[in-house]
Amino acid sequence: APAAMSCLGTDADPTYVPYLRQKLVEVIVKAESRLQAAEVGYSSIDASHYTAVRRWVRRPDRMAQDPFGNITVRANMHAGANWDDVTGESGPEDPTLGVLAVRSTKGEPLALLTNFSMHYFSGEAAISSDYFGRYCEILEEKIAGDDAPEFVAMMSHGCSGDIWRKDYTQATPSEIQQLD
């Protein structure tokens, strides 16, 4: 999406801001018109087999150069084959896959919000809905199908700056599990 606000050296897109504002008003009005009594449930599972820590602490004598040319980098992503440079993982992962489900008082699915702490990964694609989008598409197909076209699946991005899908502690990376 274009920039909605000026940030990090990028100016807000002057045509996108009013468009976005109008679309936000439309979805708020639509949501308000559909308000109804509902039931909420939640759960969580350990999904550690889908994620691993991707940042590694470097040895004090093997610190790396920062973008300004100073030797200050004590942790780096993707240790890969540089095992002699690191002392270990930079911290624990959050393996929890949390789920919040909303259904009508008649038991019809309305929405599902999932939270997962894993960094996005789009592969070679420059623009992608990534696993967030594919995950939601699959949930919408499997939970609601054509019977509940208003059902919405969402996935929020948990605390995941250091977490990725590949486990570098494994000598041979395990096959990446596909969502399909």
Language model features by range: what are they?
Residues 1-151, 156-159, 163-179:
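Conserved beta-alpha junction segments in alpha/beta enzyme cores
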